[in-house]
Structures are given as structure tokens and as C-alpha cells.
A protein has these predicted regions:
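ATP-binding N-lobe of GHMP and related small-molecule kinases
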Residues: 1-92, 110, 114-116, 151, ...
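Glycine-rich beta-alpha junction loops
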Residues: 30, 40, 142, 181-186, ...
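Active-site rim beta-loop-alpha module in soluble metabolic enzymes
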Residues: 181-241
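Alpha/beta catalytic cores of group-transfer enzymes, especially the acyltransferase/condensing modules
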Residues: 116-175, 241, 261-263, 268-271
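Short beta-strand-to-loop capping motifs
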Residues: 38, 148, 182, 272-276
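DPxDG-like acidic metal-binding loop motif
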Residues: 30, 92-118, 139-144, 148-149
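Glycine-rich, charge-dense phosphate/pyrophosphate-binding loop(s)
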Residues: 218-321
């Protein structure tokens, strides 16, 4: 009898959340689902969003991380047959690379016999990403605040001298979310290039105040505070020219049941927090604002994914018969 495949679901994420630049992330309710089994040769079958990108075996991010991790550990990488069901927009600020890197690491541990814990996988993924915010939310689920603790370099072993510190923030409210996704992707490197190297004390203090207020507002379910708490001086003003959805939608904060608006990750997608009773009105207002600006976007209604795969690591998911 053939061994059952290994199945893993990795949620999309929205990081930065306005002022919490490189420090907070939120897991979203749509995901990359990976099914893998040992095979004679590497192969990938993909369905869903960006399936043509996901199906490329050559230079495949999941498989590259899988092979490189086992090579660094001195282990052989058994060929895998992957089946991917993807709902995460690629290159649009929704954590697609974090999900892929976590998938590759999880596959390396599962099929390469590495004695890594969930913490080891998270630390390795954060090193590969260069910052922990997306991988923390994807791996642990919910709202996660995190802190880098040293230079990020690809690991050669599961234990790193200074792994990131993370903390899940309990949410008293099931936040309703809307993600506005444009047609064109934006490389994170390009979005980083436009940021200044130095910030003023005034801007630093403003962001610190807003970030602290934001985390507590999300924890307590205080939607009335989000419009102010999502204000940012560190990255959104500089990325607005690359992410035209943001200036088009930011004026909607506090109106039409839209509680707050922020760039999703480095963009170009935009995350909106909604009042529970105003989803239809909010979507209509977003479409009208986009129309006035001559813009188009796909609107994805979702909620916070409260648990990530790292919370159940070791309890392998199995496909139903």
C-alpha cells in the first residue's frame, strides 16, 4: 500500500498593519494547501490562483527550500510529487513567499528525517524571509507580534544563535476583513527601495504610539480606534506611489462600515477592517472609490485565521478518503 500523502495548509498573511512595520502580522482566511508524497521524480500539479506559476518545477520556491535545507543538513532529498491548491495572490503583499518557504521547510523535516521542532521551522523561515512578521502569522495563526534578534542569514542547522521572539495576541473579536488585490504584482525588493534609511524622532514616536494602540485595539475588539491606530509614517507614505489602491481607499476609513485601512505587507494589496453589519455597504464604497480613481481590484472577503499549522506540528493532516 502506498504511503498516505503529507498535507499542510498555510494561510495568507497581512504584515506591517500600518505602523507595526516588520513587527506584526495577521493570518487570513485563505491559504496554500500542499499535498506531498515521495515519488520517482520531482513533479508539481497546481490549481487555483496563479496555477501556472505554482506548477513550474524549475526554480520552484517550495522545492528549492526543501532541497537546500536537506543539502545543508547533509541529507538526501527524496523526489516529491506535489499537489498545490493555491488561494494566495503571488507577489501582492499577502505572504505568498512566507507560506512557500514554510512549506519547503516542513517538507524537508517530514521527508528528510530532520529532528526539528515547530520553533526550529519558524526560526529557519524567518531567516530565509529576512523578517519574522509574515512567517510568524502564517505558522502560528491569528495576530502575532514578533522581534528579530540578529542578522538574518539562511540557516545551516535548525538552532540559530538568536531566533526571533514572537507572541500571539488573543483576539476578542472575529474581525471581518476585505482585501483589495490589484492585477499587477509588486516585488518586495522594489517596495523596500523607496524607504528612507533614517527616520526622525517625531515619526518614530508617532509610529510607536500607533503600533501599541493598534495591537491593544485589535486585542480588545475596539474597531472605533482602528482608523487612527493604523496611521503610519514609516512605509505607507513612501509606497503610495507604487500602490495606488492605498491613497484611493484610505479616505474611506471611518465611513461606510470601514473601520480602518492599511497596506497589506509591502503592497500593492490593501487590507480593510470592516464592521460586522456593513460588508455589502463597504464593498460598494470600495468599488465606487476605485472607479473614481480609475482603478480596478479584486475584493476578497475573509476573516482572521486563528490557528496556524505550527500550533499542531506533529499531528499530520491526512486527506479524507
Amino acid at each position: 500500500m502506498a504511503a498516505r500523502p503529507f498535507v499542510l495548509s498555510l494561510p495568507a498573511t497581512s504584515a506591517n498593519l500600518g505602523p507595526a512595520f516588520d513587527a506584526a502580522g495577521l493570518a487570513l482566511g485563505f491559504a496554500l494547501r500542499v499535498k506531498a508524497r515521495v515519488a520517482e521524480v520531482f513533479s508539481v500539479r497546481a490549481s487555483g490562483r496563479d496555477a501556472e506559476i505554482c506548477a513550474r518545477v524549475d526554480n520552484h520556491l517550495i522545492l528549492n527550500v526543501y532541497r537546500q535545507t536537506l543539502d545543508a543538513a547533509g541529507r538526501l532529498a527524496p523526489p516529491l510529487a506535489l499537489e498545490l491548491e493555491n488561494a494566495i495572490p503571488i507577489g501582492k503583499g499577502c505572504g505568498s513567499s512566507a507560506a512557500a518557504r514554510l512549506a519547503g521547510l516542513a517538507l524537508a523535516v517530514r521527508f528528510g528525517g530532520l529532528a526539528w521542532s515547530a520553533e526550529d521551522i519558524f526560526a529557519a523561515a524567518a531567516a530565509l524571509e529576512g523578517h519574522p512578521d509574515n512567517v510568524a502569522a502564517c505558522w502560528w495563526g491569528g495576530l502575532v507580534v514578533s522581534r528579530s534578534a540578529g542578522a538574518a542569514a539562511p540557516p545551516t542547522a535548525p538552532a540559530t544563535p538568536a531566533p526571533p521572539t514572537w507572541l500571539r495576541v488573543p483576539l476578542r473579536r472575529a474581525w471581518r476583513l476585505l482585501v483589495a488585490v490589484p492585477a499587477d504584482a509588486l516585488p518586495t525588493e522594489r517596495a523596500r527601495e523607496v524607504l528612507p534609511a533614517v527616520y526622525s524622532r517625531q515619526d518614530a514616536v508617532a509610529n510607536l504610539q500607533n503600533a501599541l494602540l493598534l495591537v491593544e485595539a485589535l486585542h480588545q475588539g475596539r474597531g472605533d480606534l482602528l482608523a487612527a491606530a493604523l496611521a503610519d509614517r514609516w512605509h505607507q507614505p513612501y509606497r503610495a506611489a507604487l500602490c495606488p489602491l492605498l491613497p484611493a481607499l484610505q479616505p474611506l476609513a471611518g465611513t461606510h462600515g470601514i473601520l480602518g485601512v492599511a497596506l497589506s505587507g509591502a503592497g500593492p494589496s490593501v487590507l480593510l477592517f470592516l464592521d460586522d453589519q456593513a460588508r455589502v455597504e463597504a464593498s460598494a464604497a470600495v468599488n465606487q472609490a476605485l472607479g473614481r480613481a480609475g482603478l480596478q481590484a479584486e475584493l476578497l472577503e475573509t476573516q482572521v485565521q486563528t490557528r496556524g499549522p505550527g500550533m499542531n506540528w506533529g499531528r499530520w493532516e491526512r486527506p479524507r478518503a
